[in-house]
Amino acid sequence: MEKINVLVVGNGGREHALVWKLAQSPWAKHIFVAPGNGGFSKLENVTSVPIGSSPSDFGSLVDFATKHNVGLVIPGPEQPLVDGITTWFQKAGIPVFGPSAKAARMEGSKTFSKDFMKKHNIPTARYENFTDYEAAKQYIANSSHNLVIKASGIAAGKGVLIPANKQEAYEAIKEIMVNKQFGSAGDEVVIEEFLEGDELSILCISDGYSFVDLPPAQDHKRIGDGDTGLNTGGMGAYSPAPIGTPSLLEKIRKNILKPTIDGMRKDGYPMVGCLFVGVMVTPDGDPKVLEYNVRFGDPETQTVLPLLKSDLLELMLATVEHRLDSVDFQVHADKYSTTVVVAAGGYPESYRKGDEITVKEPLPENTFIFHAGTKEENGKVVTAGGRVIAATAIADTLEEAVKKAYVGVDHISFKDKYNRTDIAHRAFKEKPKNKVSLTYEDAGVSVDAGNQLVEKIKKSVKSTKRPGADSEIGGFGGLFDLQRAGYTDINNTLLVAATDGVGTKLRVAQIMDIHNTVGIDLVAMNVNDLVVQGAEPLMFLDYFATAHLDIKVAADFVEGVADGCKLSGCALVGGETSEMPGMYAPGHYDTNGTAVGAVLKENILPKKDKMNAGDVLLGIASDGVHSNGFSLIRKIIETTDYSYTDPAPWNPKSTIGEEVLIPTRIYVKQLLPATRRGLILGLAHITGGGLVENIPRAIPDNLSAEVDMTTWNVPEIFKWLGKTGGVPINDILKTLNMGIGMVAIVKPENVEEVIKVLKEAGETVYTIGKLVERKDLPGCTIKNSEDLY
């Protein structure tokens, strides 16, 4: 990774906090801010650029970024995103951390976002959208619950009105729709049910597929202490908010964040950037969406970024490259943060500008000042907006963070400054005198869910019963009786074990919400590694780990494992389902499996001492890409214009995601008869490394495998992946199976019989090459691959 220049667009406190955090990255060469404010001059390697952020400025911004070799652009405010700034830079080949104009409609149009929530079953308040004033009046007249009235467009954070009664509601819609209080932003309004409870701000970074969420924050919108007075852009925030318990956050991730990210992608406008979700936590503990924003919040950004342990620039680059899940995301889980905004006297109504600001140095440790409505004038920093500046502090406790933030406020001086004195007051509500006990579920682990899963999968597990094992689960392990399985000559019997996982194919399964096929993959990756040693799979154990157990997902996965066990003739005798809050991103899980088999000593493969030049290589067809090479496959799909839900170009009746999720073929029952008859000298399971690296594992060092690619029809999926990704042919041959899932090494005189046995078992078999003397050759040579695609 090379150092890059970064351009941040905006001039507020949010942008100051972003630049402050980005400047800590070793990968930041220089940071430009357009237009910036009075606080940037003290930061090293940071330059303010006098270019605005309106559509008329987009061309100048692109020219500047091109001239200064900018490697990443970060628009801060919402309006440029709604106006399509992302497309301008992308057309110039410059990556942008921020969504397209289509995706920005989630903030730019409240009617659009409410309809999106309805379509994707995302919990929110009951609502109706109106463009007709009289129809809106009639809806209010017929309503029996308290209402919230929202101008659909962007109204500088002030377009939400909460009337106390119907008369105020009538006045509100008249002001918005008739008198145009918010201009064209009020051409359409949303009238929705008033929700009661505690608000929570969730900042979620997403690459369109994966997402990570920053610690939950609470904002303070009202100008006065005790949440009184007029609405503002935000007078302070604190994080993590105590109401954001592990179990609540898992609900938010599962019911709100994941459906939103998935829904936006499936609807054709993926969220690439920061999705800021305003959530209301109702008295019964259910989170509901109040609104979406498509950028970092203000002042929440000033609050949560000091809690971020990871490199922000690295996170953003991974986001725009659609590989967010490759970055280690960490926060300071043992710290609290508080931000207090200092405003000009008279804000949010009329206020004076041009007053000199001074900040007494040095600031207390872990206390930071973020400028917003400031500018440099004649060598001095002066007020230039309503919300002028903010003090943020982090500490080991919330109480200490609040105190330190107010000490920071005391270091700020300008005429008629104003700030609230009760930031974080909701966190300090009088606590019950009786000590509240914590349960395992409060910590994010549901024992009941685990028990429900066991009951749900018992039937599937039982269906894998075979001689030697009863496939009962719920005990401390699995037992197997070798003699009942037919291995009566114990002294001549060896046990063989294999362990493997599925790799990043799991991410595609999670994106597509298809989980049973990767269960089959898990079994296949293990039992195929047993059969290449001549062994019969006898029993299987699986491991499934996630942050929060989704019973349906886990059950689908285990049912797939059971299907794989039945296909290979082994018993599913046990496993482990591990729920580990904080260890995995929302919706993510990992898995591993172990298979144990048996083989008579005379049947052990490979029989390298019996192999000679001239022995024949038989290729047994794969069912697709199987389970290897998915880091490359995902990169090809996710960095092009294709989506997993698009029709597959090589098979339009199926989606790309469904095609690549076709499970690994299991070759056990088809191969064992021939191996036990001594017809096969060796087998190579074609996994990571492709034909080039796997066949040599099954042959002696004095021989080389010579494979001719004209001997079978390479499936179109492999050609499409190679061509679309611009993958060098030598690389794809070392990564994917190219349509051959298993290779058998056979004496020439046995070829006809082996092909017959395999075809009778339903396999497609090709004679793909032979063994030759090694001499100076590599372990495997692929001929006639030049015109593959």
From Swiss-Prot:
Record EC number: 6.3.4.13, 6.3.3.1
Reactions catalysed: 2-formamido-N(1)-(5-O-phospho-beta-D-ribosyl)acetamidine + ATP = 5-amino-1-(5-phospho-beta-D-ribosyl)imidazole + ADP + phosphate + H(+); 5-phospho-beta-D-ribosylamine + glycine + ATP = N(1)-(5-phospho-beta-D-ribosyl)glycinamide + ADP + phosphate + H(+)
Role this protein plays: Catalyzes the second and fifth step in the 'de novo' purine biosynthesis pathway; contains phosphoribosylamine--glycine ligase (GARS) and phosphoribosylformylglycinamidine cyclo-ligase (AIRS) activities.
Annotated ATP binding sites: 140-201
Gene: PUR25
Location of region: GARS: 1-428
Molecular function terms from GO: ATP binding; metal ion binding; phosphoribosylamine-glycine ligase activity; phosphoribosylformylglycinamidine cyclo-ligase activity
Subcellular location: Cytoplasm, Cytosol
Taxonomy of the source species: Eukaryota, Fungi, Dikarya, Ascomycota, Saccharomycotina
Pfam families, alphabetized: AIRS, AIRS_C, GARS_A, GARS_C, GARS_N
Note on cofactor: Binds two magnesium or manganese ions per subunit.
Binding residue positions for Mg(2+): 291, 293
GO BP: any one term: adenine biosynthetic process
UniProt organism field: Pichia angusta (Yeast)
Protein's name according to its UniProt entry: Bifunctional purine biosynthetic protein PUR2,5
